[in-house]
Regions:
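Class I S-adenosyl-L-methionine
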Residues: 1-155, 159-161
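Internal anion-binding site segments
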Residues: 148, 157-158, 162-171, 179
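FAD-binding beta-loop-beta segment adjacent to the flavin cofactor pocket
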Residues: 167-170, 174-202
Length: 203
Protein backbone atom coordinates (compact mmCIF):
# COMPACT_ATOMS: atom_id res chain seq x y z
CA UNK A 1 0.00 0.00 0.00
CA UNK A 2 2.94 2.30 -0.63
CA UNK A 3 1.51 4.08 -3.69
CA UNK A 4 -1.75 4.89 -5.48
CA UNK A 5 -1.96 1.40 -6.97
CA UNK A 6 -1.67 -0.11 -3.50
CA UNK A 7 -4.39 2.08 -2.02
CA UNK A 8 -6.75 1.21 -4.88
CA UNK A 9 -7.88 -1.82 -2.86
CA UNK A 10 -9.42 0.44 -0.23
CA UNK A 11 -11.57 2.00 -2.96
CA UNK A 12 -12.63 -1.52 -3.99
CA UNK A 13 -13.49 -2.34 -0.38
CA UNK A 14 -15.52 0.87 -0.09
CA UNK A 15 -17.53 -0.06 -3.21
CA UNK A 16 -18.12 -3.60 -1.94
CA UNK A 17 -19.31 -2.20 1.39
CA UNK A 18 -21.71 0.20 -0.33
CA UNK A 19 -23.06 -2.06 -3.08
CA UNK A 20 -22.96 -5.45 -1.34
CA UNK A 21 -22.59 -7.53 -4.54
CA UNK A 22 -23.47 -11.22 -4.40
CA UNK A 23 -19.93 -12.03 -5.46
CA UNK A 24 -16.74 -10.39 -6.66
CA UNK A 25 -13.44 -11.36 -8.25
CA UNK A 26 -10.19 -9.45 -7.83
CA UNK A 27 -7.04 -9.96 -9.89
CA UNK A 28 -3.48 -8.82 -9.28
CA UNK A 29 0.11 -9.73 -10.07
CA UNK A 30 1.22 -12.95 -8.42
CA UNK A 31 3.88 -11.10 -6.40
CA UNK A 32 1.07 -9.73 -4.23
CA UNK A 33 1.05 -13.03 -2.34
CA UNK A 34 4.53 -12.42 -0.93
CA UNK A 35 4.47 -8.62 -0.83
CA UNK A 36 5.72 -7.20 2.48
CA UNK A 37 6.39 -10.75 3.71
CA UNK A 38 2.76 -11.68 3.17
CA UNK A 39 1.35 -8.86 5.29
CA UNK A 40 -0.37 -7.08 2.39
CA UNK A 41 -2.50 -10.07 1.42
CA UNK A 42 -3.33 -10.65 5.10
CA UNK A 43 -4.69 -7.11 5.39
CA UNK A 44 -6.74 -7.53 2.20
CA UNK A 45 -8.28 -10.82 3.34
CA UNK A 46 -8.96 -9.45 6.81
CA UNK A 47 -10.87 -6.47 5.41
CA UNK A 48 -12.88 -8.66 3.03
CA UNK A 49 -13.82 -10.98 5.88
CA UNK A 50 -14.85 -8.01 8.02
CA UNK A 51 -17.25 -7.10 5.21
CA UNK A 52 -18.94 -10.45 5.91
CA UNK A 53 -17.85 -12.19 2.72
CA UNK A 54 -16.73 -15.78 2.40
CA UNK A 55 -13.26 -15.54 0.86
CA UNK A 56 -11.43 -18.81 0.10
CA UNK A 57 -7.64 -18.86 -0.05
CA UNK A 58 -6.47 -16.89 -3.11
CA UNK A 59 -4.93 -18.92 -5.92
CA UNK A 60 -2.37 -18.15 -8.61
CA UNK A 61 -3.75 -19.12 -12.02
CA UNK A 62 -2.11 -18.99 -15.45
CA UNK A 63 -4.10 -17.94 -18.52
CA UNK A 64 -2.17 -20.50 -20.58
CA UNK A 65 -3.78 -23.30 -18.56
CA UNK A 66 -7.21 -22.10 -19.67
CA UNK A 67 -6.82 -22.07 -23.44
CA UNK A 68 -5.19 -18.65 -23.87
CA UNK A 69 -1.72 -18.55 -25.52
CA UNK A 70 -0.26 -16.08 -23.01
CA UNK A 71 1.98 -16.90 -20.06
CA UNK A 72 0.06 -14.70 -17.65
CA UNK A 73 0.10 -15.67 -13.98
CA UNK A 74 -2.20 -13.73 -11.70
CA UNK A 75 -3.41 -14.09 -8.15
CA UNK A 76 -7.19 -14.42 -8.07
CA UNK A 77 -9.28 -13.46 -5.04
CA UNK A 78 -12.99 -14.29 -5.03
CA UNK A 79 -15.57 -13.46 -2.42
CA UNK A 80 -19.21 -14.42 -1.86
CA UNK A 81 -21.81 -12.48 0.09
CA UNK A 82 -22.73 -14.74 3.02
CA UNK A 83 -26.36 -13.60 2.83
CA UNK A 84 -26.72 -15.51 -0.45
CA UNK A 85 -24.79 -18.68 0.33
CA UNK A 86 -26.86 -21.90 0.32
CA UNK A 87 -27.36 -23.50 3.73
CA UNK A 88 -25.49 -26.63 2.67
CA UNK A 89 -22.62 -24.70 1.10
CA UNK A 90 -19.26 -26.29 1.93
CA UNK A 91 -16.48 -24.49 0.13
CA UNK A 92 -15.43 -22.97 -3.18
CA UNK A 93 -12.90 -24.72 -5.35
CA UNK A 94 -10.95 -22.81 -7.97
CA UNK A 95 -11.00 -24.32 -11.46
CA UNK A 96 -8.05 -26.53 -12.27
CA UNK A 97 -6.56 -25.63 -15.61
CA UNK A 98 -4.58 -27.87 -17.90
CA UNK A 99 -2.09 -27.45 -20.71
CA UNK A 100 -3.67 -27.94 -24.12
CA UNK A 101 -0.85 -28.76 -26.53
CA UNK A 102 -3.01 -27.60 -29.45
CA UNK A 103 -3.12 -24.02 -28.17
CA UNK A 104 -0.61 -21.72 -29.90
CA UNK A 105 -0.03 -18.07 -30.73
CA UNK A 106 -1.41 -18.63 -34.23
CA UNK A 107 -4.85 -19.03 -32.65
CA UNK A 108 -5.05 -15.31 -31.88
CA UNK A 109 -3.30 -13.84 -34.92
CA UNK A 110 -5.28 -11.93 -37.53
CA UNK A 111 -4.95 -13.04 -41.15
CA UNK A 112 -4.39 -9.54 -42.52
CA UNK A 113 -2.46 -6.92 -40.59
CA UNK A 114 -1.66 -3.37 -41.72
CA UNK A 115 1.91 -2.21 -42.25
CA UNK A 116 1.55 0.32 -39.43
CA UNK A 117 2.06 -2.50 -36.94
CA UNK A 118 5.52 -3.35 -38.34
CA UNK A 119 8.14 -1.70 -36.13
CA UNK A 120 10.57 0.80 -37.65
CA UNK A 121 14.21 0.07 -38.41
CA UNK A 122 15.24 2.44 -35.63
CA UNK A 123 13.06 0.72 -33.03
CA UNK A 124 14.13 -2.75 -34.17
CA UNK A 125 17.81 -1.79 -34.02
CA UNK A 126 17.25 -0.40 -30.53
CA UNK A 127 15.57 -3.60 -29.36
CA UNK A 128 18.45 -5.71 -30.66
CA UNK A 129 21.07 -3.43 -29.10
CA UNK A 130 19.39 -3.62 -25.69
CA UNK A 131 19.11 -7.39 -26.02
CA UNK A 132 22.86 -7.65 -26.66
CA UNK A 133 23.57 -5.36 -23.71
CA UNK A 134 21.44 -7.45 -21.36
CA UNK A 135 23.07 -10.64 -22.63
CA UNK A 136 26.51 -9.26 -21.75
CA UNK A 137 25.22 -8.57 -18.24
CA UNK A 138 24.14 -12.19 -18.00
CA UNK A 139 20.37 -11.74 -17.91
CA UNK A 140 17.60 -12.54 -20.35
CA UNK A 141 15.95 -9.15 -20.51
CA UNK A 142 15.03 -7.58 -23.82
CA UNK A 143 12.46 -8.02 -26.56
CA UNK A 144 10.53 -11.28 -26.94
CA UNK A 145 9.93 -12.69 -30.42
CA UNK A 146 7.18 -15.16 -31.28
CA UNK A 147 5.61 -16.81 -34.33
CA UNK A 148 2.38 -18.62 -35.09
CA UNK A 149 3.78 -21.92 -33.80
CA UNK A 150 4.90 -20.55 -30.42
CA UNK A 151 2.96 -22.10 -27.55
CA UNK A 152 2.35 -18.75 -25.85
CA UNK A 153 3.52 -15.14 -25.59
CA UNK A 154 5.00 -13.48 -22.57
CA UNK A 155 2.75 -11.34 -20.39
CA UNK A 156 1.62 -8.13 -22.06
CA UNK A 157 1.04 -5.04 -19.97
CA UNK A 158 -0.62 -1.63 -20.25
CA UNK A 159 2.64 -0.18 -21.60
CA UNK A 160 2.75 -2.62 -24.52
CA UNK A 161 2.19 -0.04 -27.26
CA UNK A 162 5.18 2.06 -26.20
CA UNK A 163 7.57 -0.26 -28.02
CA UNK A 164 5.98 -3.73 -28.27
CA UNK A 165 9.04 -5.39 -26.75
CA UNK A 166 6.99 -7.78 -24.60
CA UNK A 167 5.61 -9.66 -27.60
CA UNK A 168 6.77 -9.13 -31.17
CA UNK A 169 5.58 -11.31 -34.04
CA UNK A 170 8.05 -12.58 -36.64
CA UNK A 171 7.47 -11.60 -40.27
CA UNK A 172 9.21 -13.08 -43.30
CA UNK A 173 11.54 -10.64 -45.04
CA UNK A 174 10.85 -7.63 -42.82
CA UNK A 175 10.98 -6.33 -39.28
CA UNK A 176 8.73 -7.97 -36.69
CA UNK A 177 5.42 -6.39 -35.83
CA UNK A 178 3.45 -5.56 -32.74
CA UNK A 179 0.18 -7.24 -31.89
CA UNK A 180 -2.99 -5.51 -33.05
CA UNK A 181 -5.60 -4.36 -30.51
CA UNK A 182 -7.82 -7.27 -31.59
CA UNK A 183 -5.00 -9.76 -31.02
CA UNK A 184 -4.33 -8.23 -27.62
CA UNK A 185 -8.01 -8.56 -26.77
CA UNK A 186 -7.93 -12.22 -27.77
CA UNK A 187 -4.90 -12.72 -25.53
CA UNK A 188 -6.97 -11.34 -22.66
CA UNK A 189 -9.74 -13.85 -23.34
CA UNK A 190 -12.15 -11.50 -25.13
CA UNK A 191 -14.15 -12.99 -28.00
CA UNK A 192 -14.36 -11.19 -31.34
CA UNK A 193 -17.80 -9.76 -30.60
CA UNK A 194 -16.12 -7.54 -27.99
CA UNK A 195 -16.18 -4.01 -29.39
CA UNK A 196 -12.99 -1.95 -29.14
CA UNK A 197 -14.55 1.55 -29.08
CA UNK A 198 -11.40 3.60 -29.71
CA UNK A 199 -8.72 3.92 -32.37
CA UNK A 200 -5.78 1.53 -32.65
CA UNK A 201 -3.47 4.15 -31.18
CA UNK A 202 -5.61 4.71 -28.09
CA UNK A 203 -6.56 1.06 -27.55
Amino acid sequence: FEDARGTLFFDVARIIRAKRPKAFMLENVKQLKGHDKGNTIKVILSILNELDYYVPDPQILNAYHFGIPQNRERIIIVGFNKDYLPKKFKDFKYPVGKIDKKVCVGDILEKEVGERFTISDKLWEGHQARKRMHKKKGNGFGFCLFNKDSKYTSTISARYYKDGSEALIEQVGKNPRMLTPRECARLQGFTDDFIIPVSNARS
